[in-house]
Structure formats: structure tokens, C-alpha cells
């Protein structure tokens, strides 16, 4: 099935975070990848069943994974829409795009910057 996917840009995600908008930013990669680095404010969801349990159908949801070629966020988007979630968007650029912009990350693999 071909989806007309709702996308959100890097700058729009950053604006939503800066404004402290009420939305669920969901990283759909492995637990290891999430612990290594993720966008601040993200939650990790490992399975479709966990998504259904932790997300309400009327939540404002943004799913992302590693980058433009990562299919995990496409699959998560399609799964949620198929299950009646009405406010789902995909941040296609993911971690790679976010990091290239110099935006902050959290996690065990994030280098701490020294501001001297």
C-alpha cells in the first residue's frame, strides 16, 4: 500500500522542542542505538505492541530513525496510521540530519563539548 506520508522538517522538530510543544518524539531504532544517541526529549519504542500501549491515537507523534534511507520510521509511520493514529509525521532526516545541523543530542556516544 502506498502512503501519502506526512513529513516534518528538522527545523520544525527543533521549533516544537524549543517551544516545549506537547508531542511524542519517537525513535524507532534498537535500544542500543537509542542509548548511544538520540534527539533530546525522545522516547524509545521497540515493538509495534509497545507503540499501541504507550501512544494514544490522538497524540501528536513524530517518528524518526537514523536518516533518509532508514526504513524503520517508514514502517512505524505506516503501522500507526493503519491502526487509527491520526496525527503522525515522519522526520525523514533522523539522527544523521539532526547531528549534521549541529543540534544537541543525548546518549552514551555523544561527545561532551567543552565551552572554554
What is each of the regions a protein language model found here?
Residues 1-34, 106-116:
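Flexible, polar/low-complexity N-terminal or interdomain linker segments that lie immediately upstream
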Residues 18, 23, 45-67:
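Mobile, glycine- and charge-enriched loop segments
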Residues 30, 48, 94:
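A generic "binding-loop/recognition-motif" signal
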Residues 34-40, 52-56, 98:
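Short loop/helix-cap segments at secondary-structure boundaries that form the rim of catalytic
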Residues 42-48, 86-90:
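Short hydrophobic/aromatic-enriched beta-strand-loop microsegments
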Residues 43-44, 61, 105-109:
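Short, hinge-like loop/turn segments at secondary-structure boundaries
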Residues 55-99:
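Catalytic cysteine-centered active loop of the rhodanese-like fold, especially the PTP/DSP P-loop
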Residues 84-87, 96-116:
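Charged, elongated alpha-helical/coil segments that serve as electrostatic interaction surfaces
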Amino acid at each position: 500500500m502506498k502512503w501519502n506520508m506526512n513529513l516534518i522538517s528538522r527545523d520544525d522538530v527543533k521549533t516544537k522542542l524549543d517551544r516545549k510543544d506537547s508531542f511524542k518524539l519517537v525513535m524507532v531504532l534498537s535500544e542500543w542505538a537509542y542509548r548511544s544517541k538520540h534527539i533530546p526529549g525522545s522516547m524509545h519504542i521497540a515493538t509495534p505492541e509497545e507503540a499501541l500501549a504507550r501512544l494514544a491515537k490522538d497524540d501528536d507523534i513524530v517518528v524518526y530513525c537514523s536518516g533518509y534511507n532508514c526504513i524503520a520510521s517508514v514502517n512505524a509511520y505506516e503501522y500507526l496510521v493503519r491502526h487509527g493514529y491520526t496525527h503522525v509525521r515522519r522526520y525523514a532526516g533522523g539522527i544523521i540530519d539532526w547531528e549534521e545541523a549541529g543540534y544537541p543530542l543525548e546518549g552514551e556516544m555523544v561527545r561532551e563539548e567543552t565551552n572554554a
